[in-house]
């Protein structure tokens, strides 16, 4: 992606919500490489899908020759961003936040190149400049440049202040000042001139631009990404089980892959532009192919492969595809113990059982059947498989060979209703 038309290409992909000064940004990019940053607050022990668009934007800029700075908010994470939040965030301990900072830095690292010469990525932590700052310095050097009148009129704050049941503490109110100072420090240390981030960060971005101008007389620029939603208007990146995380221990690669496989037809080509590095021409060609094939679209599988490989690597992708194929075919011989652990984590419903249980009890405990009587009828009708093999004996007791790797037995009722028994 050439630097000269980078912004145009991002706009074509729908990745630009607004540019604070589009003409100035175009002129600056025409002059040569720029340093830019995106902040990631440690509000949990993992990033989630909502962080993926700005993270991939950093990668897109680096591929075009620019220098990305990934800022993890070790200090701002101790405060919490109040923007558009209905209630105040729970304050976490310093030890917890530091642990989350370390995890998030490790998650960010594979997406960027930290050893590629002049545009090598930088990992920064705003605790480095806030950790030893005293309150007098904060108020005199930073606070005096912010107008309370302007701050309370920002929509992100106004929504909270207008609620009778939930106000805003001074702690949260100071978040905007902290984030404003981040850019000033990054501008000083790394000559950062551009910030990218979610469109819900516009208020914070404009405050940072203003503070950097006041303190250093430097003109810096903001490039907010759009808020990603599904075609039906619902929030993107959520499932019935909650957020889709980038940490494989919180959302398994199989579950992650399935999330993308289940993308609606109305969203899939848009998401290919947001979350992959396929060219617009390739995406348009795929859309045309799907339209004329007379078959189920291929786009969801392309999207799932591309994004799962980006986040979990080739090994994670192959495991996800292997599990998917085995569940579809009913043959489990290719599954490894680690694959079964993914299924136990979040792939299919799971129940723990003591050895010695019979099949009818397993169907009831797993909620595949409501009662032993109904379980008996279902087994007799040849609708139950154990590890892919039909079982029609209602009096069947599990054998040692049914316990794969000594730990797992996969039950299926009909074609799609699974439960994994984890033996105690």
From Swiss-Prot:
GO molecular function: ATP binding; RNA binding; tyrosine-tRNA ligase activity
Domain of life: Bacteria
Pfam family, one: tRNA-synt_1b
GO cellular component: cytosol
Catalytic activity: tRNA(Tyr) + L-tyrosine + ATP = L-tyrosyl-tRNA(Tyr) + AMP + diphosphate + H(+)
Binding site for L-tyrosine: 37, 175, 179
EC code: 6.1.1.1
S4 RNA-binding domain: residues covered: 357-414
Membrane-spanning segments: none
Short sequence motif 'KMSKS' region: positions: 235-239
Positions occupied by motif 'HIGH' region: 42-51
Keywords carried by this UniProt record: Acetylation, Aminoacyl-tRNA synthetase, ATP-binding, Cytoplasm, Ligase, Nucleotide-binding, Protein biosynthesis, RNA-binding
Annotated ATP binding sites: 238
PANTHER family: TYROSINE--TRNA LIGASE, MITOCHONDRIAL, TYROSYL-TRNA SYNTHETASE
Subunit structure: Homodimer.
Role summary: Catalyzes the attachment of tyrosine to tRNA(Tyr) in a two-step reaction: tyrosine is first activated by ATP to form Tyr-AMP and then transferred to the acceptor end of tRNA(Tyr).
Protein family per UniProt: Belongs to the class-I aminoacyl-tRNA synthetase family. TyrS type 1 subfamily.
Protein name as it appears in the record: Tyrosine--tRNA ligase
Organism whose genome encodes this protein: Shigella flexneri
């Amino acid at each position: 992606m050439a630097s000269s038309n980078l912004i145009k290409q991002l706009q074509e992909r729908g990745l630009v919500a607004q540019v604070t000064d589009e003409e100035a940004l175009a002129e600056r990019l025409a002059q040569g490489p720029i340093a830019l940053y995106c902040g990631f607050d440690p509000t949990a022990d993992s990033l989630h899908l909502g962080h993926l668009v700005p993270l991939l934007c950093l990668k897109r800029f680096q591929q075009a020759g620019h220098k990305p700075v990934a800022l993890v908010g070790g200090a701002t994470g101790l405060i919490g961003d109040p923007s558009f939040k209905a209630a105040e965030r729970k304050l976490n301990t310093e030890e917890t936040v530091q642990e989350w900072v370390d995890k998030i830095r490790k998650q960010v690292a594979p997406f960027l190149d930290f050893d590629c010469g002049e545009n090598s990525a930088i990992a920064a932590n705003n605790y480095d400049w806030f950790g030893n700052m005293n309150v007098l310095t904060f108020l005199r050097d930073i606070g005096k440049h912010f107008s309370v009148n302007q701050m309370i009129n920002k929509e992100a704050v106004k929504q909270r202040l207008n609620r009778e049941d939930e106000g805003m503490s001074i702690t949260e109110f100071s978040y905007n000042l902290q984030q404003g100072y981040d850019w000033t420090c990054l501008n000083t240390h790394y000559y950062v001139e551009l910030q990218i981030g979610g469109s819900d960060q516009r208020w914070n971005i404009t405050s940072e631009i203003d503070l950097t101008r006041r303190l250093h007389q430097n003109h810096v620029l903001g490039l907010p990404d759009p808020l990603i939603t599904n075609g039906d208007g619902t929030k993107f990146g959520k499932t019935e089980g909650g957020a889709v995380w980038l940490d494989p221990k919180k959302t398994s690669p199989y579950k992650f892959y399935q999330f993308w496989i289940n993308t609606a037809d109305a969203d899939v080509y848009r998401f290919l532009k947001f979350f992959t590095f396929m060219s617009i021409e390739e995406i348009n060609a795929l859309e045309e192919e799907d339209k004329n094939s007379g078959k189920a679209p291929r786009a969801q599988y392309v999207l799932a492969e591309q994004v799962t490989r980006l986040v979990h690597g080739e090994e994670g992708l192959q495991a996800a595809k292997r599990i998917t194929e085995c569940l579809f075919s009913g043959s489990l011989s290719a599954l490894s113990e680690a694959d079964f652990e993914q299924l136990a984590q979040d792939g299919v419903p799971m129940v723990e059982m003591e050895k010695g249980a019979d099949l009818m009890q397993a169907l009831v405990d797993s909620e595949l059947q409501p009662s032993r009587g109904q379980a008996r009828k279902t087994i007799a009708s040849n609708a139950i498989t154990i590890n892919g093999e039909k079982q029609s004996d209602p009096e069947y007791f599990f054998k040692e060979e049914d316990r794969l790797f000594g730990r797992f037995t996969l039950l299926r009722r009909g074609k799609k209703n699974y439960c994994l028994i984890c033996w105690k």
